[in-house]
Amino acid sequence: MNLSSIRGAVRAFAAVLVTVGVSAPAVASTINQNTSWTIDRSGTTTKYRVVAYGDSIYAGYRGSVFNVAKRSAPWVDGEYLSTKWASDIEVVRRTKSGALASDIYNNKIVGERSYMQATSTRAVSFEMCGNDGLQARSSFAGQSGTCNYAVLNTALNNCTTYTPLAMQAINQYATTARVKTVSNLYYPGYNADNGLAKCTDSATGQRPNRQNVFLPYVARINWRTCNFASQNGFQCVDSFAQWMGADYDSNGDGQVDSVALRYQQGESEAAYVTRITTTLRSTLRDSNAHLVSAGTSYDYLQSDDTHGTYYGSATISSGLFGGGSGSGAPDFSNAQIVNGQNPQWNRFGHERMGHGISLFDPATPN
């Protein structure tokens, strides 16, 4: 390793210290976590590529800067595609944990566009607004005195700016992709936010409930994400509905909660926000206890109350010195995937999101 490489590694390690919470002022708390894994199906040599761009969610972050969960949402989708197409699937994740939407757009989607330009690419997916929201939430929660909502509006505006730009770039570069998807945001820490802010609202003179403040912003981001998808030839994976709503009808309105919460094409932003924050508010559930039935729940969030849980213990190296790669057989056989669902599809956060992506997969690769 030459001197330049050593210096680069030191800078990367400093960034890692911030990412894991060790004090290192003036260093950005982001780290690239790139991986490539080929799902090697027996009896075929045909290989197609899935490319995923995003932050720690698509990375499969699991509390380590050295490795990520193998079965993150894009990998799960890749396994479904391998079954559907009877082919090998290379799952390429170009992700940056801690990154804002602008960073993901500029340095991952545009800066690393060559990965989706490969002629073997058949599916591209991205997510990008989570850290804008998390950082704005943290900033607001730390305020005292008069509440300043500007940080929340900035996060909303940045997501509104970079989401369609990301779609336009993917449309330009991923010319062989059969399907393009974007995931909207689930709400991590929903229950934890159900408390009073430290600051005082200038209009009411009262300390606002943090959940009441944040939920409308999440709803606006999600409506805009799905609306931009419809305008740019993308499919919107409604992770908010799938994670935050029970998989049965809890309020007796005749609809399964996770279905009733979905984005509806043609619905106005104002109507969607009202439906999420008021009409169906009572059906929202913290993802730490996602109800698949009235008596059965599964934890979709890790102990950090932010990142999705994942099936199995397998990991892929990533982080400081570049990405990790590997290959292996599918985890689930064709016989285990029934009606497009593996046996774990609704028991872990990443399994649920990966299944959500797979709902839009075409029947054939060409």
What are these regions (language model features)?
Residues S29-T95:
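Serine-esterase "nucleophile elbow" of acetyl-processing enzymes
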Residues G266-N366:
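Histidine-centered active-site loop/cap adjacent to the catalytic His
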Residues N2-F13:
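Bacterial N-terminal signal peptides that target proteins for export
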Residues V110-S303:
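Alpha-helical cap/lid subdomain in secreted, periplasmic
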Residues A24-A28:
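Sec/Tat signal peptide C-region and signal peptidase I cleavage site
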Residues V91-N106:
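Functional beta-strand-loop-alpha-helix junction segments that form "active/interaction loops"
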Residues A12-G21:
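Bacterial N-terminal signal peptides
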Residues N34-S36, I104-M116:
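Alpha-helical scaffolding within the catalytic cores
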